[in-house]
A protein has these predicted regions:
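Active-site-proximal alpha-helix that buttresses catalytic centers in soluble enzyme cores
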Residues: 2-71, 97-103
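Phosphate-handling substructures
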Residues: 17-19, 59-117, 201
């Protein structure tokens, strides 16, 4: 039997301008914790950013005994982009807002994050990561063998849950993507580009 390693990726809750969770963000984090409370995790890892740490701590309240720790590999940075020269203007504008040094550092961190976390394990395992929109898109892009720039446009809602399965000798499987079914309607779609939010029924 091939061991199954599940990587759960949660985007932090909604945050204010000071990087602290808003009231809605705290509710989103708690709802994610409630949703995940029956999953047996080996560890919870999170970005060093305050909004991710607060989210991880609130989720951990539902997962007693699971070790929690920060990793600089899971921070809020720009993953690599070496795509076509004719990127859509919004994407090109995003790249222009980062210095060459920031882009180089982000590429190194993103590569290291994949090597550390996006891999099969020697036994059945589930690990939870609380991180940011860009990096979750980067993990999904990697799982699907898409071009490295294609994390752009893969957006996550605050409190959304994405799950990727890794097994030795097999391609990664995207089990679920941006699951927000655990969030009440008023807490869904925050942090998501307004122009692509599905219209209400």
């Amino acid at each position: 039997m091939v061991p199954s390693r599940y990587l759960y990726l949660v985007r932090h809750g909604e945050a204010d301008d000071d990087d602290a969770l808003t009231g809605a963000g705290r509710l989103q984090a708690s709802a994610a914790g409630e949703r995940l409370r029956y999953t047996r995790f080996s560890a919870i890892r999170h970005s060093p950013m305050q909004r991710a740490e607060e989210t991880a701590d609130l989720i951990a309240d539902f997962l007693p005994g699971v070790p929690v720790g920060a990793s600089g590999l899971l921070g809020d940075y720009l993953p690599p982009v070496s795509g076509p020269p004719d990127l859509p203007p919004p994407y090109a504008g995003l790249l222009g807002s980062y210095t060459p040094e920031e882009r180089s550092e982000g590429a190194e961190l993103a590569s290291a994050a994949i090597q550390r976390y996006a891999r099969p394990g020697g036994q059945d395992d589930s690990e939870l990561i609380v991180t940011h929109n860009f990096l979750i898109g980067w993990f999904v892009r990697h799982a699907l063998d898409a071009p490295d720039w294609r994390w752009m446009g893969l957006n996550q809602c605050n409190g959304g849950i994405t799950v990727i399965l890794y097994r030795t000798g097999m391609p990664a499987s995207l089990v679920s993507y941006n699951d927000i079914g655990h969030l009440p309607p008023a807490l869904r779609w925050t942090g998501f580009p307004a122009e692509i939010v599905p219209p209400p029924r």
